């Protein structure tokens, strides 16, 4: 599901379930802003916990040795940061 599809689903539910009068573009902008805030927090090294959904956290992967298949030589894979997601217990149950 893309960001656009998420915004469209939220838009449809707002109109159907809550009779909210809002434009699709406004919903898309809100969804974009939510993702921007999550990204900014993760880039600062902060944990993002969404109750009932899960937690996003940035971890550092240690450098390791890898293989360049084309050249058949061992290469050093540098340290890098990755985003991990741990679903909440409620998320797993549903």
UniProtKB/Swiss-Prot annotation:
**Any idea which UniProt keywords this protein has?**
DNA condensation, DNA-binding
Domain of life from the UniProt record: Bacteria
Q: Which GO terms describe its biological process?
A: chromosome condensation
**GO molecular function list:** DNA binding; structural constituent of chromatin
Instruction: Please name one Pfam family that this protein belongs to.
Output: Bac_DNA_binding
Under the heading PANTHER family, the entry gives: DNA-BINDING PROTEIN HU, INTEGRATION HOST FACTOR SUBUNIT ALPHA
Q: Which family does it belong to?
A: Belongs to the bacterial histone-like protein family.
Record's function text: Histone-like DNA-binding protein which is capable of wrapping DNA to stabilize it, and thus to prevent its denaturation under extreme environmental conditions.
- The protein's name is DNA-binding protein HU
List the source organism: Aquifex aeolicus (strain VF5)
Taxonomic lineage from the root: Bacteria, Pseudomonadati, Aquificota, Aquificia, Aquificales
């Amino acid at each position: 599901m893309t960001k656009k599809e998420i915004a469209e689903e939220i838009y449809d539910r707002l109109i159907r379930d809550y009779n909210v009068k809002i434009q699709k573009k406004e919903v898309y902008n809100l969804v974009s802003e939510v993702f921007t805030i999550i990204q900014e927090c993760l880039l600062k090294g902060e944990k993002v916990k969404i109750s009932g959904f899960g937690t996003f956290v940035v971890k550092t992967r240690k450098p390791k040795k890898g293989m360049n298949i084309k050249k058949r030589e061992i290469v050093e894979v540098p340290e890098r940061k990755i985003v991990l997601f741990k679903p909440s217990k409620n998320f797993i149950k549903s």
